[in-house]
Amino acid sequence: MTDTPLLPSITVDTGRDPDASVIWMHGLGDTGQGWSQVVPELGLPPALSVRFVFPHAPSMPVTINQGYVMPAWYDIRAADLTSRADLAGVSASRTRIEAMIAAERARGVAASRIVLAGFSQGGVIALHTGLRHAERLAGIVGLSTYLVDPGSLAAEASDANRAVPILLAHGLRDPVIHYEWAEASRNALEKGGWKVEWHAYPMEHEASHAEIRAVGSFLTRVLAAKASG
C-alpha cells in the first residue's frame, strides 16, 4: 500500500515537531480546504502538538448526481442505504488513506498516535479504513456518516483495533444520511464489541460548534499521553 501515490492535501500543525496526526476526510463535492478551518475551533490544549492532514479526494462521476464529476471518495449509486456505496471505490479510497497513514509513520509518528476522522463520505472511509488497519490507532471520528457493508466487519476487522476509541456524531434532522442509519451503525459497532462515544445534535447534514468541541475533547483525550507503539 505504501507504493500508492499520496493524495494532495492541506496540513495544519498546532505546534512545533508534532508527534501525533489526524487524517481528516471531507465529504462529497468538498475539498480538504473547508475542514482545515475547524482546527482552531477544536480547543486543543497548547501542549498538544498535532499535525492535521486534510487530503483532497479525487474527482469522479457521481451516479446519484447525474454523473456530474466532483471530488468523491467513492461513487454513490442510489439514495437507499443498502445499494448506496460503490464498495470497489470504498476499497480504493481505503488504499489511498493507508498510504497517508504510512507517510505519517515514515516521519516518525506511531500508529497509536494517529486518528482517522471524516465527515459524511469521509467518515465512511475513516471507519472502513480504521477498523481494518493492521496497527492500533489512537481513534476514529465519524461525523454525519454511517458504517458501510457492516456484514463484512466481523471477518475483516483488525484485531489491533478491536478496542479503538470511536466517536460518532449526527444531526437529528439529517436528510442526506438519515439519523436511523447512523443509529444502526452505532448499534452494529456496539454489537461487535466496540465502545462508541455517541453525540446527537438538532441539526441537518452539517457540523455545529458543539460537535466540533466534542471532537476536540475526544482528540485531547485519545492523544493526551505519548504511546510507544
Where are these regions (language model features)?
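Primarily recognizes the serine-hydrolase "nucleophile elbow" in alpha/beta-hydrolase
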Residues: 105, 110-161
